[in-house]
Structures are given as C-alpha cells and as structure tokens.
Amino acid sequence: MPTLTVRRRTLPKAKRHWDAAQVKALRAFLGMTQQMFANELGVRQQTVSEWEKGIYRPRGASVTLLNQIADNAGFKHPDDK
C-alpha cells in the first residue's frame, strides 16, 4: 500500500478550492482507491465519495492536508498560478 509523506511547510496565501473534480483528479494522480485515499487523510471512504460526487466539499484540516499532499506529489492544481 502506498504511503504519503506530509512535510510541514508554509502554504501559499492563495487558497486552493477543492471541488469534486479536483479531489478525484488528485486521487487518480496518486493512483489510490477511495479507501486508500481516505485512510491517508484520516476520513471515511464515504467522505471521499461524497467529495467526489460534489455532495460536500473538503474544509478545514482536510483542505490543509489535500494542499500538502498535492504539493508533495507534484500535482498541478488549477488554482496554482
């Protein structure tokens, strides 16, 4: 099972917006199932599914983790300038 390394670093002031398509794109970029991705984020698989369906959006600590994971993996988010 792949593991992700999260390093502490200062995030850019511009806030990324994680919509359904971006969450799914990051997960696919990492080659993870919803369950694997959920385990790394410390959320339920159902939560990842709901994010990817647009029922809910990530917020708070989940957004911070998504930003760190995306940065560490070299994922290009559309909000990055």
Residue positions per predicted region:
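Short alpha-helical DNA-recognition segment
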Residues: 31-50
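Key DNA-contacting residues within the recognition helix of helix-turn-helix
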Residues: 24, 49-50, 59, 67
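DNA major-groove recognition helix of helix-turn-helix
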Residues: 52, 62, 70
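Non-catalytic, surface-exposed connector residues within folded enzymatic/regulatory domains
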Residues: 17, 59-60
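Residue-level signal for the short linker/turn that defines the boundary of a DNA-recognition helix
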Residues: 18-21, 31-32
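N-terminal flexible/basic segments that precede or flank functional cores
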Residues: 1-17, 66, 71-81
